[in-house]
A protein has these predicted regions:
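Alpha/beta-hydrolase-fold catalytic nucleophile elbow
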Residues: 94, 155, 180-181, 226, ...
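C-terminal catalytic histidine-bearing segment of alpha/beta-hydrolase fold enzymes
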Residues: 198, 244-245, 250-289
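The conserved beta1-alpha1 loop
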Residues: 49, 54-56, 227
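Primarily recognizes the serine-hydrolase "nucleophile elbow" in alpha/beta-hydrolase
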Residues: 135-207
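N-terminal cap/lid segment of alpha/beta-hydrolase-fold proteins
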Residues: 3-46, 50
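The feature captures the conserved acid-bearing segment of alpha/beta-hydrolase catalytic domains
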Residues: 190-250
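Cap/lid segment of the alpha/beta-hydrolase catalytic domain
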Residues: 54-132, 138-139, 143-144, 189-192
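Loop/turn elements at helix/coil->beta-strand transitions in domains of secreted/extracellular proteins
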Residues: 48-49, 86-89, 149-151, 173-176, ...
């Protein structure tokens, strides 16, 4: 991982609303590289529980932070905005290659492929880069006085759900995670000849086990997996097998690992979002605070 440098945060825009303030912020992730994000802060005095909201992929590289912030895209994906209305500080950053982090010449998946290949050649991988950027997002959230650094959750759909799983596994500042349609087993993906985003593939991971080994690293912290019964890109059988195999890591905290399956495919429906928000409430604000 790169050397941790000063965040050098800045605020480019501040918009007041009835429930609080939305800020367009940026912070340094590496030397010479900054990430842009939307931050929501409730109007009530804090510190508040906070949620890092990671956007989906959907091959819509023009969308990143703006979708969970409720400014563009699919209303099913407006979870940073919806959680802010429930009293959370929320942060929605652009992933590399999306929205304000698109390349000036290479477009869409061409740039995603370039970044993945470049990092493989350097002895790393795109997943490592994405995780570093998200760890810097946690640094930023924890430094905000409105947020309680001991009550930080992570939520994402699709790519966001995938990154929620990996980030929860490697950074224990994530007190609770929710992954919506974010993983299956690699075996299920390969058996079904299903391609995914480049960050999904970590060199050598299968030599140590499947995705259940990643999920097991989250224990004993609470983790909720939401799945679509007919999700065509994250087969349900592989999701079930992953959660089942990870339960040994949760032997002393069985109630903290849960899988819920909903009708439909690769979506984040209102019932799924409500289940996600209830899980976050349960662990981040048990007394309603």
């Amino acid at each position: 991982m790169p050397e941790r440098s000063a965040l050098r945060p800045s605020v480019a825009e501040r918009v007041a609303g009835p429930g609080g303030v939305r800020e367009r912020v940026s912070y340094a992730v590496e030397r010479g590289e900054r990430v842009q994000a939307y931050l929501f802060v409730p109007a009530a005095p804090g510190p508040h529980p906070a949620v890092l909201c990671i956007h989906q992929h959907h091959r819509q590289f023009h969308l990143g932070k703006s979708e969970p912030a409720g400014l563009a895209g699919d209303p099913e994906q407006f979870y940073a905005l919806e959680l802010a209305a429930r009293g959370y500080v929320t942060l929605a950053p652009d992933a590399i290659g999306f929205e304000e982090r698109q390349h000036a010449v290479l477009q869409g998946q061409d740039y995603e492929r370039f970044e993945a290949n470049k990092r493989l050649t350097e002895g790393s991988c795109l997943q490592a880069k994405m995780l570093w950027d998200l760890m810097r997002a946690l640094d930023y959230l924890a430094a905000r006085p409105e947020a309680d650094p001991t009550r930080i959750g992570c939520l994402g759909h699709s790519l966001g759900g995938q990154e929620t799983l990996f980030l929860s596994a490697v950074d224990r500042r994530v007190a609770v995670g929710v992954s919506s349609c974010g993983f299956s087993s690699y075996r299920a993906l390969f058996d079904g000849a299903i391609n995914h985003n480049f960050a999904a593939y970590v060199p050598g991971l299968l030599q140590h086990g499947d995705v259940d080994r990643v999920l097991g690293l989250v224990a004993p912290r609470p983790f909720l997996a939401l799945a679509g019964k007919d999700d065509p890109i994250f087969p349900l059988a592989g999701v079930r097998a992953t959660v089942r195999a990870a339960r040994h890591a949760y032997a002393e905290a069985a109630e903290r690992l849960r899988l819920r399956v909903f009708p439909g495919g690769h979506g984040f429906s209102a019932p799924m979002r409500e289940a996600a928000y209830a899980w976050l409430d349960r662990w981040l604000r048990p007394g309603g605070s």
